[in-house]
Amino acid sequence: MRKPSITITTAKAIITPDYTLIKSHSKYQLPSRFQKLDADSPERSTVVKLFYRRFMRLKPFISNVKMVKDTYRDYVRYKFMKENYELKRYLVFNPDGLRSKIKLELLSNTKCCERILPVTEMQRTLEFVLKSCSYLPETKAQKWDIARDNTYCRQILKNLLTMQYEKYRSILHRGIGHDELDVKFSHLKTTSSPLTKLNKTEKKKIPLFKVFSDFDTTLIYLNETLGTRL
């Protein structure tokens, strides 16, 4: 027997068994215009908090699965509080033989509060996540091209969170430290040591490092194409 269809209407949303329609979008969208800020700008902390709150408010719409929502929450926190994206990008675009030790040291030692705030990229990333949370049926009557764009965003975000969850599992259960993957980005650095000189634990890391390296490299190139900071 088919379940009865129930619609709940509140001041902020219309809720059905399948979908939620948000009436007011101001909590999730940004003011119409931003400009890049210097590291020393007094407005920096205000803008960071503004973005952070909006990303976190989208958590309930990411998935119905608690594990996925928790992974999204942890990933947003990491992006805002710990990730050295410029170091990660440098490792991807500069093969091992072309890397400057001085440049690597400079990037590695730069504190989060000293980095230029990429407001344009952050805004595009927020738009990307908003699209991934928005649903339109893929029919000509419902603007097929927009619906398909939202579907692509949703699928990419799902894959990103799946891979991030695998990183968390590797950190917890497979002897790989958090600093190796998310701070030093060891999986993006090739080792010159032959396999015979590696211990058993280090040998086990090689297949995982290869998977994470391929994914993060692809993600960096995707960000370069879309102008995002996923």
UniProtKB/Swiss-Prot annotation:
InterPro entries assigned: Irc19
Keywords for the protein's UniProt record, in alphabetical order: Sporulation
Top-level lineage group: Eukaryota
GO biological process: ascospore formation
Family stated for the protein in its record: Belongs to the IRC19 family.
Function: Involved in sporulation and maintenance of the mitochondrial DNA. Is probably involved in a pathway contributing to genomic integrity.
Protein name: Increased recombination centers protein 19
Provenance organism: Saccharomyces cerevisiae (strain RM11-1a)
